[in-house]
Amino acid sequence: MRDENDDDDVKRNTTNTNTFRRAFVTGAASIFTASAAFFQTSSSAFAKLPEFQYEDSELRTAASGMQYADVVVGTGASPQKGQTIQAHYTGRLTNGRTFDSSYERGSPLKFKVGVRQVIQGWDDGILGAEGIEGMKVGGKRVLIIPPELGYGARGAGGVIPGNATLKFDVELVAVL
């Protein structure tokens, strides 16, 4: 048997649930709008970034399918697996859209190379693999990375679609 208190509890729970849903949807919409504004602003800023210049005839292809071209051959130290390096970069999709750039942030990326802290295409393109000669400090290289050496079918962060071929302009700044 139900009494009036049960009906009040049901109404109160329904009201609380509806209030929570409204707050969640409003919050999610606000976050989405802010994110969209950020990426729209970032994308327009990225559009100004220059690309490394090279001739298609300079592109070499490794057994993995990765293509690369040295725009500037460095004269400094070559990093070894596990060493920390600093590298500036701009990442683009094949349609030319820039998705990330350390140049835009004004600070090079610092990471240990060759230990999977970055995508395999970066490790191979910087250290050298499958006939690719390793980079030296001061070097600038274009890497065209197939999906298997990038983010694969999963893509990344809603910014890089699944199965995307990626183009990176990479400048090896320092071996630390």
List the predicted regions and their residue ranges.
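Cross-family detector of peptidyl-prolyl cis-trans isomerase
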Residues: 2-176
